């Protein structure tokens, strides 16, 4: 990319900065949850909604981000995304109650939902096609560093300052990013078709109320009648969307996508698989601190091997799938992740702490292989006219399933535990043991979906589409 103009390189740096902010925030909060609970007077076993409120908002807003960027301009939307994310960070730091924090996290989620997809769109518009892959590699690299730094940085700030600083550090960075965006980013626009507002609202209502209903009386405090009402509203909204999208060329997501068998299998497997995987980044630091008595910084450091394993495996995942095929790889990694989850629980409860980094490294390797395989399986056979829509739907499902996974993990903790817990006590460890056992079972279930993938499905068919897969 050395032959690109200086202005273009600066614009790529701005996009990379946005990727870093968004990826850092998805991991930095996890380590701080027990300290937040103590400060806000809440049970640490009920803090999962801090993550769910952010991830669910991202899932809801993702379908609108690309259309808004084309309609209003990439600079205007990217600037708005950074401002909303920064304001959300400020309000998070100022929150005095859990409800205030949840609202602030939702505002952050609106900004986060627009930052990454609009950043990708910007790269497509400012970089020549032959340099697109190199440019995307450059801007996504900081996004890979964010999860590596997030847990340890979050633990460090919590231990030596306070949890408020995990949000306050975003403010000066956000201000600089917003100013740089206004000064350096071009405001590309495109002619757009009419936005499917009806479909967007139906999907948003369906996803939001079903997730709230899943949280149940343990998390939200809703009565059984209220939960039943939420389920009914959510199901009706999703059924109405299916009716709305049938034979509708302007639908948010065309039902023609599901005529491609591997897309249907991959999407179903991704949804079920990421429910299980979404539990792990939430549960691991909470378990290390509440169940085993680790300090926030120590718990954050323990997450680094998992990220390193994930990053290292990305280099060879194509060769692995080429050698063994999608079905074998996905079934093996799904069952393997379940076994590694049990291994982590066992070694931790036995006090073999020196083994934990190796187990977490292995967990990261297995999880990364499964993620990459799920993404390419889902998108590789789609025709060109449906590839963009399929990628957007996959991105939304990824975020939705992760929010459901965290919700289920919180529900399990509430089911097996109580409002008041003692750090590093036998009773608390029993609560976590039952939760980990349940999680291992849930993580293994998608193997039944992946077993239906045709045995002759191999990676070499998908290499040409890898650039379209969700990150």
Swiss-Prot record:
The chain crosses the membrane at residues 12-32, 49-69, 77-97, 102-124, 138-158, 165-185, 197-217, 225-245, 263-283, 286-306, 342-362, 396-416, 431-451. It is a multi-pass membrane protein. One of its GO terms (cellular component) is plasma membrane. Belongs to the major facilitator superfamily. TCR/Tet family. HAMAP family: MFS_MdtD. Pfam families: MFS_1. The gene is mdtD. Residues 1-11, 70-76, 125-137, 186-196, 246-262, 307-341, 417-430 are periplasmic. NCBIfam families: efflux_EmrB, PRK10504.1. CDD domains: MFS_LmrB_MDR_like. Gene3D superfamilies: MFS general substrate transporter like domains (1.20.1250.20), Multidrug resistance protein D (1.20.1720.10). GO terms for molecular function: transmembrane transporter activity. It is found in: Cell inner membrane. Keywords: Cell inner membrane, Cell membrane, Membrane, Transmembrane, Transmembrane helix, Transport. PROSITE patterns: MFS (PS50850). This is Putative multidrug resistance protein MdtD. Residues 33-48, 98-101, 159-164, 218-224, 284-285, 363-395, 452-471 are cytoplasmic.
């Amino acid at each position: 990319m050395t032959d690109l103009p200086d202005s273009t390189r600066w614009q790529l740096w701005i996009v990379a900065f946005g990727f870093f902010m968004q990826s850092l925030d998805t991991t930095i909060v996890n380590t701080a949850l027990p300290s937040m609970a103590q400060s806000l007077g809440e049970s640490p076993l009920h803090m999962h909604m801090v993550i769910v409120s952010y991830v669910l908002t991202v899932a809801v807003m993702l379908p609108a981000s690309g259309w808004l960027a084309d309609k209003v301009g990439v600079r205007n939307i990217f600037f708005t995304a950074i401002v909303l994310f920064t304001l959300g960070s400020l309000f998070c730091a100022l929150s005095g109650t859990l409800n205030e924090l949840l609202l602030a996290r939702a505002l952050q989620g609106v900004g986060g939902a627009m930052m990454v997809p609009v950043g990708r769109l910007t790269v497509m518009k400012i970089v020549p096609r032959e340099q697109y892959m190199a440019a995307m590699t450059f801007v996504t690299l900081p996004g890979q560093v964010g999860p590596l730094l997030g847990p340890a940085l979050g633990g460090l700030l919590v231990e030596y300052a306070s949890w408020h600083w995990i949000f306050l550090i975003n403010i000066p960075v956000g201000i600089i990013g917003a100013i740089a965006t206004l000064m350096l980013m071009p405001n590309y626009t495109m002619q757009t078709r009419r936005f499917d507002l009806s479909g967007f609202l139906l999907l948003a209502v369906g996803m939001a109320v079903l997730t709230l209903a899943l949280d149940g009386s343990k998390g939200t405090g809703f009565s059984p009648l209220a939960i039943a009402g939420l389920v009914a509203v959510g199901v009706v909204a999703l059924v109405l969307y299916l009716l709305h999208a049938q034979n509708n060329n302007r639908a948010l997501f065309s039902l023609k996508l599901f005529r491609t068998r591997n897309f249907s299998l991959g999407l179903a497997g991704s949804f079920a698989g990421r429910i299980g995987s979404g539990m792990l980044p939430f549960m691991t630091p909470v378990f290390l601190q509440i169940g085993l008595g680790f300090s926030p910084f120590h718990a954050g450091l323990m997450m680094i091997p998992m990220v390193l394993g994930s990053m290292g495996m990305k280099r060879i995942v194509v060769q692995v799938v080429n050698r063994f095929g999608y079905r074998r790889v996905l079934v093996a990694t799904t069952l393997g992740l379940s076994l590694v989850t049990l291994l982590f629980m066992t070694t931790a409860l036995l006090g073999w702490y020196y083994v934990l980094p190796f187990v977490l490294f292995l967990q990261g390797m297995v999880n990364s292989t499964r993620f990459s395989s799920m993404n390419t399986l889902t998108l590789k056979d789609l025709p060109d006219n449906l590839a963009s829509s399929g990628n957007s739907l996959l991105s939304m499902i990824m975020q939705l399933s992760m929010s459901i996974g965290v919700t289920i993990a919180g529900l399990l903790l509430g089911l097996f535990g109580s409002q008041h817990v003692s750090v590093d006590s036998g009773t608390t460890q029993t609560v976590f043991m039952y939760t980990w056992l349940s999680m291992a079972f849930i993580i293994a279930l998608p193997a039944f979906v992946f077993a239906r993938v045709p045995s002759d499905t191999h990676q070499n068919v998908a290499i040409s589409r890898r650039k379209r897969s969700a990150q």
